């Protein structure tokens, strides 16, 4: 009997080995972006999905279809051939696909962008009803559907083309002053430089004077003879640019600037409008980034509101506002403000009808706040509100994305504004990318998880109607010999905080062998490398290295994203120190596994991960045999003002912290082999931060 059991076991093992051998091996062409087979190994997707009110639209390559949200029934609206014939008849250019079209109105109209025009097509009559010329060099385009006015920049100045096609030059500034573009190095949630009022009657914009900022030499190699094109690069502790906010009126062609006082060493962010277009709201921050104020200004005169600031928040470390206020669509006397004041980013409802005398209140981990309006916290818990998708006016709910299910996930919730009760929208599992319909009654839910290659569904936000499936993708890597990928937790260096890790074992793993290992690291703020996503976010390179026989480990250390304020700001004034301690705990975990060759452990990362890689090689030289650091910061004194000073203060006020994070001072500690990769024209981590008087790092 025992012989029979042993024979069966051998047969099973043999068949398993044969099955694994029958599967394909990956090449770099399969796994690297841009590879010949890379896109074939991505799960199937529907790229052109969007909303036209409560009707789902699939704007694909050759045609545009409507999809009924209740039953999934499809109808063709228009074809690519029909659109290009209409454009050709008016000599308005052509399009190659429908991926860039939109449906801005309740009426059956589609907005098309060619290289030279914006075009509105009446889909009932199938005719062009309006067009607006575009400058071929227009950048930072911002179109308002109500006024049909287009704001854009040419070089460093701002222009507006109105609905009748007439162009107005808003600013005429010399080189060194930039208008209508993103400011403050894209920090504080800033992604653009123009902000239309709700009806498009007024345009708020940034004006940034950077003439006083030091030039950093960059070389344009695209010209026949290379030319010098310096960047303005404000470094930590040095002079920064000055930003003001203008309000332009296309009807009068006049501009007023907000009377916010001297802009020196101040940040202006999260610009928003009141629904009646009479007021502009701005969150203002001091250069130390530890005191934020919500202020309101008269849009016609630029004068500040008498009871400014409406809200202010301070912290002994830093405050980082990233979201503009949002008014309730059914009650314009109330707006939602986002804050981490209780330790996690949450929603707070402020009532402008109930002015109160501002009093200071204690907040989480050394913070405090003062309110001029009665405020009610809408969401609460040890999880993060990631963003607001919109509202359902009928049910009086705000639709959000949050990490309530897990720090490894992003899920949609409906939050009742009156009671604060929350309702999960859609499948509980996975990472969800969600688009809300015009009324807030439906979402397009595109989600993946470790076990779900991709599902796309139309989901009612009420939870009472049936879900309509648009796509259930199969696993395109099914035919390949995949490594085993697992996720778990280990304790941080503080002995109490759980850290998530991702472990990838080599293909055809043998527990009796000793394998080399690579730690892939980022470790900085606003980044998270592990999610309940496809392959737990493992990159193609990780999988390829596992195929070559490497154990791959990634740890999201303290200081990274989506775990709350104290998890992130424990690194304040000492970037790299606590993060490295946590990464060493990851190495200790590797060593405990029994199948890792402790003398062959490497480390690799890009950007902040490049800084971490270099730092780990120099601080713990006995742990790492080899490292590859891409685009690292070598000395934080040479990094940009906004990011660097938030986490490190200035070199003048924190000399010890900057000294400890200056990797040039510890270059002599290197024992292993370290490759450092840097772009000679890198605008973010500049080459000169490596250089010393007597040579190169």
Task: Tell me the role of every PLM-derived stretch.
Residues 11, 22, 149-150, 236, ...:
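Short N-terminal micro-motifs specific to bacterial/archaeal maturation
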Residues 20-425, 429-430, 441-442, 452, ...:
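Beta-propeller folds
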Residues 8, 26, 303-305, 373, ...:
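Generic alpha-helical secondary structure signal
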Residues 1-24:
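Bacterial Sec-dependent N-terminal signal peptides
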Residues 8-10, 83, 196, 273, ...:
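Extended hydrophobic/Leu-rich segments
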Residues 215, 277, 355, 431-697:
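Serine-hydrolase catalytic core recognition
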């Amino acid at each position: 009997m025992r012989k029979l059991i042993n024979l069966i076991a051998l047969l099973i093992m043999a068949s398993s080995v044969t099955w694994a051998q029958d599967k394909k091996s990956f090449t770099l062409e399969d796994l690297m972006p841009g590879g010949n087979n890379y896109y074939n190994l991505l799960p199937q997707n529907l790229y052109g999905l969007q909303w036209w009110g409560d009707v789902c639209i699939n704007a694909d390559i050759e045609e545009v279809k409507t999809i009924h949200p209740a039953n999934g029934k499809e109808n063709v609206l228009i074809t690519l051939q029909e659109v290009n014939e209409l454009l050709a008849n008016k000599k308005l250019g052509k399009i190659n696909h429908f991926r860039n079209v939109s449906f801005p109105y309740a009426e059956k109209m589609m907005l098309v962008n060619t290289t030279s025009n914006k075009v509105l097509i009446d889909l009932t009559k199938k005719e062009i009803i309006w067009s607006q010329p575009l400058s071929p060099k227009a950048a930072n385009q911002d179109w308002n559907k109500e006024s049909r006015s287009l704001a854009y920049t040419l070089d460093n100045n701002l222009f507006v083309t109105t609905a009748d096609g007439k162009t107005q030059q808003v600013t005429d500034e010399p080189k060194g002053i930039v208008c209508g573009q993103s400011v403050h190095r894209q920090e504080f949630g800033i992604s653009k430089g123009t902000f239309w009022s709700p009806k498009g009657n007024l345009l708020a914009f940034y004006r940034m004077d950077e003439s006083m900022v030091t030039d950093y030499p960059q070389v344009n190699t695209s010209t026949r003879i290379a030319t010098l094109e310096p960047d303005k690069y404000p470094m930590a502790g040095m002079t920064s640019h000055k930003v003001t906010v203008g309000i332009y009126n296309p009807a009068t062609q006049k501009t007023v600037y907000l009377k916010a006082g001297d802009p020196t060493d101040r940040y202006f962010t999260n610009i928003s409008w009141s629904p009646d277009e009479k007021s502009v709201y701005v969150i203002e921050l001091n250069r130390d980034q530890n005191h934020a104020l919500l202020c309101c200004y008269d849009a016609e005169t630029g004068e500040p509101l008498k009871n400014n600031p409406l809200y202010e928040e301070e912290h002994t470390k830093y405050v980082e506002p990233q979201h503009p206020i949002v008014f309730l669509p059914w009650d314009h006397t109330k707006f939602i403000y986002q804050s981490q004041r209780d330790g996690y980013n949450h929603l707070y409802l402020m009532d402008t009808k109930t002015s109160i005398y501002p009093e200071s209140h204690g907040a989480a981990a050394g913070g405090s706040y003062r309110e001029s309006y009665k405020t009610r916290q809408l969401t609460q818990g040890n999880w993060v509100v990631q963003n607001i998708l919109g509202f359902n006016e009928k049910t009086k709910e705000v639709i959000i994305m949050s990490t309530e299910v897990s720090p490894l996930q992003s899920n949609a919730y409906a939050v009742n504004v009156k009671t604060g009760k929350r309702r999960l929208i859609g499948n509980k599992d996975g990472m969800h990318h969600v688009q809300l319909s015009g009324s807030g009654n439906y979402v397009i839910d595109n989600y993946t998880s470790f076990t779900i290659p991709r599902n796309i569904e139309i989901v009612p936000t009420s939870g009472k109607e049936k879900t309509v499936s648009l796509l259930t993708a199969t696993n395109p890597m099914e035919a390949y010999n995949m490594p085993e990928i697992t996720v778990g937790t280990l304790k941080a260096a503080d002995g109490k905080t759980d850290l998530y890790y991702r472990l990838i074992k080599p293909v055809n793993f043998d527990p009796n062998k000793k394998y080399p290992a690579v730690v892939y690291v980022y470790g900085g703020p606003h980044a998270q490398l592990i999610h309940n996503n496809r392959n737990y976010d493992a990159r193609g390179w990780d999988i390829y290295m596992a195929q070559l026989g490497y154990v791959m480990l990634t740890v999201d250390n303290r200081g990274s994203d989506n775990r709350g304020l104290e998890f992130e700001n424990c690194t304040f004034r000492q970037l790299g120190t606590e993060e490295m301690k946590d990464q060493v705990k990851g190495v200790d975990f590797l060593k405990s596994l029994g199948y890792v060759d402790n003398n062959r452990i490497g480390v690799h990362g890009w950007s902040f991960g490049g800084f971490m890689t270099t730092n780990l090689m120099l601080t713990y030289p006995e742990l790492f045999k080899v490292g590859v650091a891409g685009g690292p910061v070598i000395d934080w004194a040479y990094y940009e003002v906004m990011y660097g000073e938030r986490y490190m203060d200035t070199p003048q006020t924190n000399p010890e912290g900057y000294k400890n994070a200056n990797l040039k001072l510890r270059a002599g500690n290197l024992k292993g082999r370290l490759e450092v990769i840097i772009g000679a024209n890198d605008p973010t981590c500049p080459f000169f931060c490596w250089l010393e008087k007597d040579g190169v790092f």
